[in-house]
A protein has these predicted regions:
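Short beta-strand edge/turn micro-motifs at domain boundaries
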Residues: 137-162
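Bacterial N-terminal signal peptides
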Residues: 8-17
Length: 162
């Protein structure tokens, strides 16, 4: 009985060794490439965000309060050199700002999820605010969130380039 038990254990160890030794080096699992449809959807979302950035800036430039507000989420915040502002404060700033010209450069849209995107860019302006020249180059970022089928700005930050 002892011999049979020893033989059984030896056979089990040998079979296990052979089984594990036959496994080759695992090959890396290929990373699936994005489907053309998914890439197209991403490109469409990115183009939509770029259009929204331009539209909200035009509404600001033309002091179109209602048009400007329709792009802002109810919980919108803006951050600039003066501090953190809500939508009402941003609209008040719009009324005190004369934006005569602007141009975007290096715009990049990053999709964080199907409903959240971040636009980063450089903008050069010719502008005054409360009578002071504020012209220059700025770095800006906007976080967009899709709510009830509509993209809304939830956060915008704007800092003058040094």
């Amino acid at each position: 009985m002892k011999t049979e038990f020893t033989l059984c254990c030896f056979s089990l160890v040998a079979a296990t060794s052979i089984s594990f030794s036959q496994q080759g080096t695992p090959s890396p699992t290929p990373t699936p490439s994005p489907s053309p449809f998914k890439t197209l959807r991403s490109a469409t979302k990115e183009a939509t965000i770029v259009k929204l950035e331009k539209a909200v800036t035009e509404a600001f430039k033309n002091k179109q309060t209602d048009a400007f507000r329709k792009y802002l989420a109810p919980d919108f915040s803006a951050i600039d050199a003066e501090g953190v502002k809500d939508a009402d404060a941003e609209v008040a700033d719009m009324q005190n700002t004369d934006l005569s010209n602007y141009s975007f450069a290096d715009m990049k849209v990053t999709l964080l999820s199907p409903k959240t995107a971040v636009a980063t860019y450089k903008v050069t302006t010719q502008s005054t605010s409360s009578g002071h020249d504020t012209s220059g180059t700025y770095y800006a970022a906007t976080v967009w969130n899709k709510r009830s089928g509509k993209w809304l700005a939830v956060l915008h930050t704007f800092v003058k380039a040094q």
